[in-house]
């Protein structure tokens, strides 16, 4: 069997047999809002008790508070839910959308292309079987979250987000967990508690978006903005040479498990429409697309043959399926193309290169630019957010921050104001390849010219010398720009520049970028960001290995690495690891210092200082005698979990 057929078979088996797979020692908990149907999911990690004293015969333990973390996995980690990918996810937001009474259910689809696909019987085996009824704004109504926010309305989505962003941090009592460094926010407004009113205000001002198409009621509300937690996007999608519907659905579920806050379907191969339907009906996170890719497929890949009519039908098709945000490369103007002539890598954006080719072939501005107001009118009817694409982003560090890049950025700022006239939500896409010392300029320019609309960047990659490791080169830049104020980071996988990522590449990219986003939250001083770090550090110092694994971003890998050298169960309670061994563990020695300090009725630092300053010669004699009396052994075990177990 070929590798391609094997991959597809395995993916189909995954879909057919998918069952709930909770994280280790974690519980799915729901925090209820002001109404019973606002139930916000979080992952609660239970921790073992700390051994704080006593003897082998009578040890004294102290309980550790469970730690709650942000959870993007939807019902796929909820043991109370029966997974059925053929029937899709629960329609969480359906009632909220209906009760606003500003939408209507359509009798039929509006897109000509969708009608053609539905009438094609040869697609019956591929087609998602449980197609939903389509909604659209009633005539004269706008149904975007930005519109509601500007009207002073706090929607259920906004209340949901406030609860989700807070992650229940007010419940913590342990001062070890709640301690946090101040951070440098670079002007971000980070309140100690996120309220529904704060969410509404940030959306109303355009500083944040809630991607939430009325035809994607399965999505769990989330927010993108620099005054909230830094988010991560995962890219999936087939190509003309690889992947199937089954594999893309598998990647979707995998992406949400490992922390993808949104997912972009960048399919360019066969059956794009059907693939997207399967993804949307089973996605608990917002889905984005680049509609230009599908429009190009409709004209057989000939960029010059693209028309506004084809593009318009594609936008309506995808909006009625439920796509939450469109990447639109409307800022690439004809006069900017010559600016790329001296670049090392020219135009590297797929969407940008398509638009550039069309503009040169017709010698006029692109239909995305000239019909931008019509694009906004379509988006306002379904609440599709616009992700204004950077078609002239630098594809090498040599081209970073050049005239072409920033000229397009200024145009994106102008388009942002136009979209806001229609109450359409906007985020701005950014680079790309940028060396570390030039990253902050990107954030500063974006804030200046794009009116504080959220920034969404691909990395940036900080060097060009590491094919196969570009998740690392870009993770460095992502952490930095997230700190400076970027609201969402688009992940890069190890396959970047080399090939289409598989399931494991998706996981590696996501873990790398969740790490970058978290590092940015810590550096900004986001309230509560340090709780998980503190809990893991405390577990590490106390040799609570299982807690260390379970608190990590990737428990499976952490546990596997530990077990490579200490596979026995006793290794899970040992007061050392294979790095230093039992006699040279710095944390074990530190514990012994603390025990000594307790014996001196003082703090560890004070006890050591007293011993150093108080009659040094006498102190040395005393310790010499103690050492000999104890058998001249350099290290002695402290009371430990394994000793308690033996006792």
From Swiss-Prot:
EC code(s) of this entry: 4.1.99.17
One Gene Ontology term from the biological process aspect of the record: thiamine diphosphate biosynthetic process
Residues binding substrate, per UniProt: 235, 264, 293, 329, 349-351, 390-393, 429, 456
Cofactor note: Binds 1 [4Fe-4S] cluster per subunit. The cluster is coordinated with 3 cysteines and an exchangeable S-adenosyl-L-methionine.
Catalytic reactions on record: 5-amino-1-(5-phospho-beta-D-ribosyl)imidazole + S-adenosyl-L-methionine = 4-amino-2-methyl-5-(phosphooxymethyl)pyrimidine + CO + 5'-deoxyadenosine + formate + L-methionine + 3 H(+)
Pathway(s) the chain acts in: Cofactor biosynthesis; thiamine diphosphate biosynthesis
One GO CC annotation: cytosol
Keyword annotations: 4Fe-4S, Iron, Iron-sulfur, Lyase, Metal-binding, S-adenosyl-L-methionine, Thiamine biosynthesis, Zinc
Cofactors: [4Fe-4S] cluster
Residues involved in [4Fe-4S] cluster binding: 577, 580, 585
EC category name: lyase
Family to which the UniProt record says this protein belongs: Belongs to the ThiC family.
Name assigned to this protein: Phosphomethylpyrimidine synthase
Source organism per UniProt: Vibrio vulnificus (strain YJ016)
Recorded name of the encoding gene: thiC
């Amino acid at each position: 069997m070929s590798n391609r057929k094997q991959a597809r078979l395995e993916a189909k088996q995954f879909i057919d047999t998918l069952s709930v797979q909770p994280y280790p020692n974690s519980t799915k908990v729901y925090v209820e809002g002001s109404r019973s149907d606002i139930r916000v999911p979080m992952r609660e990690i239970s921790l073992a008790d700390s051994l704080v004293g006593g003897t082998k015969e009578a040890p004294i333990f102290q309980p550790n508070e469970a730690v709650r973390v942000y959870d993007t996995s939807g019902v796929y980690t909820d043991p109370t839910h029966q997974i059925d990918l053929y029937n899709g996810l629960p329609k969480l937001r359906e009632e909220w959308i209906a009760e606003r009474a500003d939408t209507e259910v359509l009798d039929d689809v509006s897109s000509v292309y969708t009608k053609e696909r539905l009438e094609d019987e040869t697609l019956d085996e591929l087609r998602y079987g449980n197609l939903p009824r389509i909604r659209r704004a009633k005539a004269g109504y706008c149904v975007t979250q930005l519109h509601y926010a500007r009207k002073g309305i706090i929607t259920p989505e906004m209340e949901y987000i406030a609860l989700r962003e807070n992650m229940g941090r007010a419940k913590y009592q342990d001062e070890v967990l709640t301690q946090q460094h101040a951070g440098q926010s670079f002007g971000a407004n980070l309140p100690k508690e996120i309220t529904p009113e704060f969410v509404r205000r940030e959306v109303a001002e355009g500083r944040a978006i809630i991607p939430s198409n009325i035809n994607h009621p399965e999505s769990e509300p989330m927010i993108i903005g620099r005054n909230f937690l830094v988010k991560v996007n995962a890219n999936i999608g087939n190509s003309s040479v690889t992947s199937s519907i089954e594999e893309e659905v598998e990647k979707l579920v995998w992406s949400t498990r490992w922390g993808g806050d949104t997912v972009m379907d960048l399919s360019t191969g066969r059956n794009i429409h059907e693939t997207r339907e399967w993804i949307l009906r089973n996605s608990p996170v917002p889905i984005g697309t680049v509609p230009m890719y599908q429009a190009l497929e409709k004209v057989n890949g000939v960029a010059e043959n693209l028309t506004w009519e084809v593009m318009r039908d594609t936008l309506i098709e995808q909006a009625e399926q439920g796509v939450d945000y469109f990447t639109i490369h409307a800022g690439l103007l004809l006069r900017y193309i010559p600016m790329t002539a001296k670049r090392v890598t020219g135009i590297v954006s797929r969407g940008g290169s398509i638009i550039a080719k069309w503009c040169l072939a017709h010698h006029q501005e692109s239909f995305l630019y000239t019909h931008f107001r019509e694009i906004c009118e379509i988006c306002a009817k379904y609440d599709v957010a616009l992700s204004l694409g950077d078609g002239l982003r630098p594809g090498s560090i040599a081209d970073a921050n050049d005239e072409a890049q920033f000229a397009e950025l200024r145009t994106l700022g102008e388009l942002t104001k136009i979209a806001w006239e229609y109450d359409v939500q906007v985020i701005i896409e950014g680079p790309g390849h940028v060396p570390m010392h030039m990253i902050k300029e990107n954030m500063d320019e974006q804030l200046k010219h794009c009116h504080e609309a959220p920034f969404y960047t691909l990395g940036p990659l900080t060097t060009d010398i590491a094919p196969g490791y570009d998740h690392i080169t870009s993770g460095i830049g992502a952490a930095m720009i997230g700190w400076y104020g970027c609201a969402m980071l688009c992940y890069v996988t190890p396959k970047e520049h080399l090939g289409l990522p598989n399931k494991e590449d998706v996981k590696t990219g996501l873990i790398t970028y969740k790490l970058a986003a978290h590092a940015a939250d810590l550096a900004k001083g986001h309230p509560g960001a340090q709780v998980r770090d503190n809990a893991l550090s405390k577990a590490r110092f106390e040799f609570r290995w299982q807690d260390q694994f379970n608190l990590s971003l990737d428990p499976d890998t952490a546990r596997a690495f530990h077990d490579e050298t200490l596979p026995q169960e006793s290794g899970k309670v040992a007061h050392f690891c294979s790095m230093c061994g039992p006699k040279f563990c710095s944390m074990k020695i530190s514990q012994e210092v603390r025990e000594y300090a307790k014996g001196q009725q003082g703090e560890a630092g004070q006890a050591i200082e007293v011993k150093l300053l108080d009659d040094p010669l006498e102190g040395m004699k005393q310790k010499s005698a103690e050492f000999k009396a104890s058998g001249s052994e350099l290290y002695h075990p402290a009371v430990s979990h394994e000793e308690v177990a033996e006792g």
